[in-house]
Amino acid sequence: MLNLVLMMIERVGLIVILGFLLSHIKTFRRLLHKQDGYVDKLKLICIFSVFTIVSNYTGIEIAGNTIMNENWLQGVSSSSTIANTRIMGVGISGLLGGPIVGIGVGSIAGIHRYMLGGTTALSCAISSILAGVITGYIGYIFKKYNRTITPKFSAILSVFIVSLEMIMILLIVEDGMSIVKTIAIPMILVNSFGSFILLSMIQAILRQEENAKALQTHKVLRIADKTLPYFRQGLTEESCKHVAQIIHRFPGTDAVSLTDTEKILAHVGLASDHHIPSHSLITGLSKEVLHTGQIMKAKSREVINCQHEGCPLQAAIVIPLTSHGNTIGTLKLYFKNPNQLSRVEEELAEGLAKIFSTQLELGEAELQSKLLQDAEIKALQAQINPHFLFNAINTVSALCRTDVEKARKLLLQLSVYFRCNLQGARQLLIPLEQELNHVQAYLSLEQARFPNKYEVKMYIEDELKTTLVPPFVLQLLVENALRHAFPKKQPVCEVEVHVFEKEGMVHFEVKDNGQGIEEERLEQLGKMVVSSKKGTGTALYNINERLIGLFGKETMLHIESELNEGTEITFVIPKKVGEEEQIVKSISS
């Protein structure tokens, strides 16, 4: 009996090794956590059936009290029986996979055992199927009530199931008592012990994975929580510096770097002497990620392709930062030892990049909301601005005495102007024709106040009037020209507005022949709010930020000016017709 126990323990070791190898396969672990439909259950049936078939083939053939064959079995003589660990695989499959998996594995194990033959072939086949049914429904009940199946419970259940198999042998096999006396105790001991070990090992590996994921999730969430206030400011050198410092404080990386599409925005850690913020990108890996938009990793200096000799960074993972589907920068985690770049670090970097991309999109949406609110406030202020309103009313009042029809038309233009203010304040994009109506209404009011002072010429391609543009853009540029471009005594004040299509882009030009802008002030306009006696430049800054936020940096304002010659403001936007709803959704998402 002792020899039989020792031999069967060897078979248990083989099954445990097989289970250990399978437990390190990601697909197998996922199937144990969750089975989505019958395909996943079929996969589990196939996997655990391998356990039971191996158990059958590695069983020990016994005739009476004599061990006949302890090698790989091809068949069993009609007078012999088998002592094996088949019940281990059937029991574990039912407990972890439920009734369908348990019955499936039990049936395959039973049929295979019956085909091997021997005096106990039928009783073992029936007991295998019963084992699958019993363990499957027990596993289902435990899962239904959210109870954990412990290895100890699995061992006790194995004692019961092997005992049931012994009862089947007594009922079906002639002279079953002698067989039971020989194999009962070894099979009960070894199968219960094997079930305990196998389930303990599988659960330990699953717990280890869950703990690693929990730790990683906690780490990512802590980093995300600390970096959120900075990414609300956008992808700037100042915000990226704080973000890189936060990530570097967490153990695991030797250096952290963030870039936009052109230059290094921040670098903290090793190699700070040549990975310098504001400098152009120096690694080929970063350029490739920006070009492809794909995650890339390197485990050698040659693959990183740093141009600086003696760079200590030997491994890296570079992840694209995206906004609305466009790659706008990269997050780079560097290591001085290639072995540090594990799968855990890769998943950490991927998780951070996704969260950072979301934070950048939220920050951009927040900025767009603020800019739209600013535009709305400006529009509302224009409605109740007493000077603007009084001047318009006084002009209409004066015309009532001399030209009633013109006064009536001017009142209509005033209503159009206010209506455009209200509509534009509630939308991100409007048809160009609506914006032109706004401009025309404003010009009618100004030209009525100052007859023959301003000459505004508009050259608009008719097919572009349905193109979607941000509200207040042209109106504010024209208003800005009339208010600030011309000295009081300039005799002829000319403004030209050109809108035309070129290479799939809509080009806008607003020119004047005014006094021009000083070079120092010209460099600041559109990029920041500038305090001066001539104005703050808020309108140009608002327009510029809205254009960049909606369409990207390539649509920013370009301002050219010469003193006493005039100023020209140009910008381009993609040609979009009838897509306002989709564009608004993409900006707000």
From Swiss-Prot:
Reactions catalysed according to its record: ATP + protein L-histidine = ADP + protein N-phospho-L-histidine
Entry protein name: Sensor protein LytS
Keyword annotations from UniProtKB, A to Z: ATP-binding, Cell membrane, Kinase, Membrane, Nucleotide-binding, Phosphoprotein, Transferase, Transmembrane, Transmembrane helix, Two-component regulatory system
Phosphohistidine modification, residue list: H387
Main location, first listed in the record: membrane
Keyword Plastid: no
Organism annotation: Bacillus cereus (strain ATCC 14579 / DSM 31 / CCUG 7414 / JCM 2152 / NBRC 15305 / NCIMB 9373 / NCTC 2599 / NRRL B-3711)
Domain Histidine kinase intervals: 360-577
One example of a Gene Ontology biological process annotation: signal transduction
